[in-house]
Curated annotation (Swiss-Prot):
Belongs to the 14-3-3 family. The lineage of its organism: Eukaryota, Metazoa, Spiralia, Lophotrochozoa, Platyhelminthes. This is 14-3-3 protein homolog 2. Disulfide bonds: none annotated. It comes from Echinococcus multilocularis. InterPro entries: 14-3-3 (IPR000308), 14-3-3_CS (IPR023409), 14-3-3_dom_sf (IPR036815), 14-3-3_domain (IPR023410).
Amino acid sequence: MAAITSWITDSGCKDHASLVSIAKLAEQAERYEDMAVAMKTIAEMGNELNNEERNLLSVAYKNVVGARRSSWRIMSSIAKKQAGTPLADQTDIYLKKVEEELTKICNDVLALLSKNLITEKIGAEAKIFYYKMMGDYYRYLAEVQEGEQNDKSTEAAEEAYQKATSLAEAELSVTHPIRLGLALNFSVFYYEIKNMPEKACSLAKAAFDAAITEVDSIKDETYKDSTLIMQLLRDNLTLWNSECETDS
């Protein structure tokens, strides 16, 4: 059974331009499942995605999985409160259903990345984008897993983030939004998944400090994205600072 269902699958549409148009319309209508299926169909056709199309794919799945991540957090909190009560079993069953949906979507994205999108022919920027995305979706899996499964997803996330980082440091400027977004998410991974606040702070601070020295050279078309991510890095550093100082 597919992780996401949509009328687009039944329509049999395989025209690249039409699918991109559908994805854009679906985004405006906030129908992210349709948006994800449209972009997945393009990727499975073997077409290399341009920058706009990569962003459409990312936004679609981020919203689809984001809804499940939010539901899982809420249900997980409710399950803890209801432990030992008559509603405990029912709550646990519902939590598992949300978890299964989230897991299927993440595995869907990871399969798409490894089988269709990360190829030898793509450029460095696309490869960094996809390895970052791979790290993100293994991180989302690790959030809901325990034991050996958690260990495997955590290791895979770190490996993907590290591959993206090595490429980004060689190929992208310190103010490039993809490089900054990667540093943001990698630092969140260390803070939330590996419980390493000092490492998280170090990574986030290095990215912010490097970017702030070059802020005047940011291109107009990426200025808004780059400065927004820099602000998010600074916000996290402010939030984490007390723990970093305690651990150091």
